[in-house]
């Protein structure tokens, strides 16, 4: 048992050290990538609705992927990554990080609601939840993303 605790402690220390040693520009590249993926998932959902595509479960799966990204998104904005590389992230993120986390959580919740609507197959409900998710994205961008 003692040995297991030592191994777990060393693993945690190693993980923390690696995270702290990461290149700040890599965080910028990472968050651009996941936010681009989020945008593409939303576009795919919109196309599926507009064109009435027969792609079973994809809308719910895409919405769940967005929710997963939003759940962990704040971790992609650690201290020391403001103004690194070419980024559209406003300093407001780090000035009021709690508000940024709340905005991310709102998007996560909206994405989960979209996933639930998608599982019913009700296109009107899916469309409404997609618009609601888009609204949370827009609100976050207004506050935290430079044009």
Swiss-Prot record:
GO BP annotation list: electron transport chain
InterPro entries: Cyt_c/b562, Cyt_c_II, Cyt_c_prime, Cyt_c_prime_subgr
Reported modifications of this chain: Binds 1 heme c group covalently per subunit.
Keywords from the UniProt entry: Electron transport, Heme, Iron, Metal-binding, Signal, Transport
Molecular function in Gene Ontology: electron transfer activity; heme binding; iron ion binding
Tagged with keyword rRNA-binding: no
Entry binding sites for heme c: 31, 87-88, 137, 140-141
Pfam hit, one: Cytochrom_C_2
The keyword Glycoprotein is annotated on this UniProt entry: no
Signal peptide span: 1-21
GO cellular component, one term: periplasmic space
Task of the protein: Cytochrome c' is the most widely occurring bacterial c-type cytochrome. Cytochromes c' are high-spin proteins and the heme has no sixth ligand. Their exact function is not known.
Complexes and interactors: Homodimer.
Protein name: Cytochrome c'
Source organism of the structure: Rhodospirillum rubrum (strain ATCC 11170 / ATH 1.1.1 / DSM 467 / LMG 4362 / NCIMB 8255 / S1)
